[in-house]
Design a protein with these regions (language model features):
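Residue-level detector of alpha-helical recognition elements and their boundaries
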Residues: 30, 42-43, 59, 70-71, ...
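N-terminal helical cap/lid subdomain that shapes the substrate entry/recognition surface
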Residues: 2-96, 100-101
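Proline-centered loop/turn at the N-terminus of a beta-strand
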Residues: 104-106, 182
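Residue-level marker of regulatory loop/turn positions in helix-turn-helix DNA-binding domains and
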Residues: 87, 108, 140
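Asp-based, Mg2+/Mn2+-dependent phosphohydrolase catalytic module
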Residues: 1-7, 92, 96-99, 112-216
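Conserved phosphate-coupling serine/threonine residues in phosphotransfer and NTP-handling enzymes
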Residues: 16, 109-111
Length: 216
């Protein structure tokens, strides 16, 4: 069922619009392995959808004595400079549908602006969004709701009538915390149960069904 009078569509990037989570995971796995630390699914879940330096700073782990910013930079350097990512199913159609319907569109991501711009190149770049909120725009990342609150503020949109799409529990919590009325959990990275436990209104396998939900 289409959410009535959608005030804005708020889209996460990694794992929602583009298939970049394997690229992120490879960098983390290499960095952890070099230190003899395990990077299993439970550890990966701490980082997915969050800024790595926030995790290093606030979550206890074998990294506790390191500098969060330095550790983040070390991981980033392990990602190949010539990386490319592919749009996930339904990403292009969702953006096109929202723009055609006149629904204000925002990117809300834990990535920095440089990463976001490159990752979005196959979809038309940051320019396809009415606004974008990246890690460069907020002091604290997801699951803190500041990023979603800022996106709604910039768009002049009622959060309660907005729709957000997120692939990770941390992102779902951020959107719910900002009062976003409809939070769709996209099961590209986590099972539906995990996303519902985080507060997702409903779950979908990918964005292919979203244009129909938005336009009725």
């Amino acid at each position: 069922m289409r959410p009535p009078r959608v005030s804005a569509l708020l889209l996460d990037l990694d794992g929602t619009l583009v298939d970049s989570e394997p690229l992120h995971r490879a960098g983390f796995e290499a960095w952890f392995a070099a230190r003899g630390w395990s990077y299993d699914d439970d550890v990966a879940g701490l980082f997915t959808g969050r800024r790595a330096d926030d995790v290093f700073r606030t979550v206890d782990g074998p990294w506790r004595d390191g500098d969060p910013q330095v550790m983040l930079e070390e991981i980033v350097r392990l990602v190949p400079r010539d990386w490319l990512v592919e749009p996930l199913p339904g990403a292009a159609e969702t953006i096109e549908s929202a723009r055609r319907a006149g629904i204000p569109l925002a990117l809300v991501t834990s990535a920095d602006t440089t990463w976001a711009a490159k990752a979005l190149a196959p979809l038309g770049g940051l320019e396809v969004f009415d606004t974008s909120v990246t890690r460069d725009d907020v002091d604290i990342g997801k699951p803190d709701p500041a990023c979603y609150a800022l996106a709604c503020e910039r768009l002049g949109a009622d959060a309660g009538a907005a729709v957000a799409c997120e692939d990770a529990p941390n992102g779902v919590r951020a959107a719910v915390g900002a009062g976003v009325g409809t939070v769709l959990g996209v099961t590209t990275s986590f099972v539906a149960e995990r996303l519902r436990e985080a507060g997702a209104t409903r779950t979908i396998p990918d964005l292919l069904t979203l244009p129909a939900l938005l336009t009725g």
